[in-house]
């Protein structure tokens, strides 16, 4: 089932808030299986003040965090996990391929490949204009 979630609906699922909410909308959601979200990267992002003032680049760790937030929406939409928190449990095989700069629109996709008990694994890919900018395997742990 595909669903569209705006920022207010995302905030009902995950606890992140400005300045650390890094997903603007979810355009595809298959509950407990996959999700696609978007982040409009603007020149006004707080992290560009220091990374780097003369050549602003979105930190790779924040791209991974944005992917993890989309993953949290996917896993927490599963009926048994609704109302809980998804913690970032780990990261494997992270690769950063291209810079993300002001004006870019990040497409953030995750496919949950394994859920066992309160833990899950997802394959995450971030793209800009159809080109991969980052990818990783993310691990999630569900808390109360």
From Swiss-Prot:
Listed GO biological process terms: fatty acid biosynthetic process; lipid A biosynthetic process
Keywords in alphabetical order: Cytoplasm, Lipid A biosynthesis, Lipid biosynthesis, Lipid metabolism, Lyase
GO cellular component: cytoplasm; membrane
Protein name stated in the entry: 3-hydroxyacyl-[acyl-carrier-protein] dehydratase FabZ
Catalysed reactions, as listed in the record: a (3R)-hydroxyacyl-[ACP] = a (2E)-enoyl-[ACP] + H2O
Family: Belongs to the thioester dehydratase family. FabZ subfamily.
Species per Swiss-Prot/TrEMBL record: Clostridium botulinum (strain Loch Maree / Type A3)
Catalytic site positions: 51
Compartments, record wording: Cytoplasm
Molecular function, one GO term: (3R)-hydroxyacyl-[acyl-carrier-protein] dehydratase activity
Cited function: Involved in unsaturated fatty acids biosynthesis. Catalyzes the dehydration of short chain beta-hydroxyacyl-ACPs and long chain saturated and unsaturated beta-hydroxyacyl-ACPs.
Name of the top EC class for this enzyme: lyase
E.C. designation(s): 4.2.1.59
